[in-house]
Amino acid sequence: MMQPKKTKFRKAHKGRIHGVASSGATLAFGQFGLKAMEPERVTARQIEAARRALTRHMKRAGRVWIRIFPDVPVSKKPAEVRMGSGKGAPELWVARVKPGRVMFEIDGVNQQIAREALTLAAAKLPIKTRFVARIAE
């Protein structure tokens, strides 16, 4: 599971995801990618599930780049605990994803396999996505 080795603070505010992605909105490494179409918090488990779906469908051929990283801690209080008495303990890590952000990139496979693999990966994510391809140069 992905998570930061060290953070400045143990807990973070919930926050909101405003605007569209300015950085990370275009393909940087691979020929094909999966782009987010709506704002959402994506957990480390969801990223890992999508990565596994990608690599299994590609049968270890090609290369995968994960362009998002879960760096925001989400805290949770234990079950059946009354409100108050402070914020809960960090439970999981999430990545705040803005619309337009390229989340995954792949290379080394043909377009049909890339589209199938990224569709399988998209099914593991709580977000509407779009398949993007680099324009033939």
Curated annotation (Swiss-Prot):
One of its GO terms (cellular component) is cytosolic large ribosomal subunit. InterPro entries: Ribosomal_uL16 (IPR047873), Ribosomal_uL16_bact-type (IPR000114), Ribosomal_uL16_CS (IPR020798), Ribosomal_uL16_dom (IPR016180), Ribosomal_uL16_sf (IPR036920). One of its GO terms (biological process) is translation. One of its GO terms (molecular function) is rRNA binding. Keywords: Ribonucleoprotein, Ribosomal protein, RNA-binding, rRNA-binding, tRNA-binding. Pfam families: Ribosomal_L16 (PF00252). PANTHER family: 50S/60S RIBOSOMAL PROTEIN L16, LARGE RIBOSOMAL SUBUNIT PROTEIN UL16M. Belongs to the universal ribosomal protein uL16 family. Part of the 50S ribosomal subunit. HAMAP family: Ribosomal_uL16. Binds 23S rRNA and is also seen to make contacts with the A and possibly P site tRNAs. This is Large ribosomal subunit protein uL16. It comes from Rhodopseudomonas palustris (strain BisB5). The lineage of its organism: Bacteria, Pseudomonadati, Pseudomonadota, Alphaproteobacteria, Hyphomicrobiales. The gene is rplP.
